[in-house]
A protein has these predicted regions:
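Beta-strand-dominated extracellular/periplasmic modules and repeats
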Residues: 2-236
Length: 236
């Protein structure tokens, strides 16, 4: 559906380089998308990472834990990720396309570029797509990812995390961030997460665990603009 002039969402005008990430092997160098406004709490940018899915992922494919519908499930702890995407006025954003990708329970990505010694799970797909409904909500099911060593760096284990990519009407670039899990000790020493100086902004990337009768459920809401705008990387 074409957008009207009033539907086009404003983009921030200031950018801050991310030189600290330039030295991280395997990560795409990006620039921060930083709002020019003063924000009370800012959810920080996160890098796209080296293992963006190389397969075609179909809209509606929200299950990361099985390669085929109804097929064998990947091993590990089942999880559900839910959330809402809103705009600058707090209005839900319908029709936004969300892509996610993550490692398996052993910390291995389903990607040919992952040459680590972590165990492969043949039933693990590890990526998916969803389109937000009229209320701006999305949902994924999968397996909680494991930690893994960052290639080329001694004693650096990346905490469990999920990569997010968001496309929405009126946004000229896809928006990239990462979701982390609460209660993970590696969160406290991860150079990427702790490269965010503002404590409140850093905490905004950690999902909130909710009660569920079917397993672990994590909430990760995304704000595209406004005073609580989520910050993202722009892929260069």
């Amino acid at each position: 559906m074409p957008t009207k002039p009033d539907d086009v969402l404003p983009h921030p005008t200031s950018f801050v380089s991310t030189e600290r990430l330039a030295q991280i092997k395997g990560y795409v160098l990006n620039e921060r998308r930083t709002p020019a406004r003063n924000l009370p709490v800012v959810t920080p940018h996160q890098t796209i990472g080296p293992f963006y899915p190389h397969h075609l992922v179909r809209p509606g494919d929200e299950d990361l834990a099985a390669c085929d519908v109804g097929g064998p499930r990947a091993e590990g702890e089942p999880m559900e990720i839910v959330g809402t995407i809103t705009d600058l006025s707090g209005k839900p954003v319908a029709g936004a396309l969300i892509e996610v990708w993550t490692a398996n329970a052993h910390g291995k990505y389903s990607h040919p570029a992952d040459h680590s010694s972590q165990l492969i799970d043949p039933n693990f797909k590890g990526y998916g797509r969803a389109i937000t409904g009229p209320s701006g909500t999305y949902r994924f099911v999968g397996i909680k990812p494991g930690a893994y060593p960052n290639p080329g760096y001694d004693n650096w284990m990346r905490p469990p995390h999920v990569h997010f990519s968001v496309y929405a009407a009126g946004v000229m670039h896809r928006l990239i961030t990462q979701m982390y899990f609460p209660g993970e000790s590696l969160n406290d020493i991860d150079p990427i997460l702790n490269g965010i100086d503002d404590l409140a902004a850093r905490a905004s990337l950690i999902a909130v665990e909710e009660k569920s009768d079917t397993g672990r459920r994590y909430r990760f809401d995304i704000v595209l603009q406004g005073e609580a705008e989520t910050q993202f990387f722009i892929e260069r």
